[in-house]
Design a protein with these regions (language model features):
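A short, surface-exposed loop/turn module that caps and links secondary-structure elements
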Residues: 33-58
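A short, compositionally biased N-terminal segment around positions ~18-40 that is enriched
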Residues: 18-40
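Enriched for short, Lys/Arg-rich terminal
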Residues: 2, 11-16, 21-25, 58-86
Length: 86
């Protein structure tokens, strides 16, 4: 599956990495797993509710998640937030 990102995601990602440079490798690893196996247990992939009902979320570390949409053969990353923020 192809990965695409929103400008909102890109801005938030840059901020998170600037605060914590070790995140870059963790994020790359989880994205690689996502592309190869959506059902891998380390992702903790799940559908969201409420305002983000059309989105999914997967785990990066601790309380950090990436939210995304699945559109045809594209995974669109929409945000990188803590669990409390969604």
């Amino acid at each position: 599956m192809e990965i695409r990102t929103t400008s909102h995601f890109d801005k938030n990602l840059a901020k998170k990495i600037k605060k914590n440079s070790r995140l870059k490798n963790k994020i790359k690893n989880q994205i690689s797993i996502l592309q190869n196996n959506l059902h891998h247990p380390s992702l903790k992939l799940h559908k969201l509710k409420g305002k983000r009902i059309d989105e999914y979320s997967f785990w990066i570390e601790d309380n950090l998640r990436i939210t995304c949409l699945f559109v045809d053969d594209v995974i669109l990353f929409t945000d990188i937030i803590t669990h409390d923020e969604y």
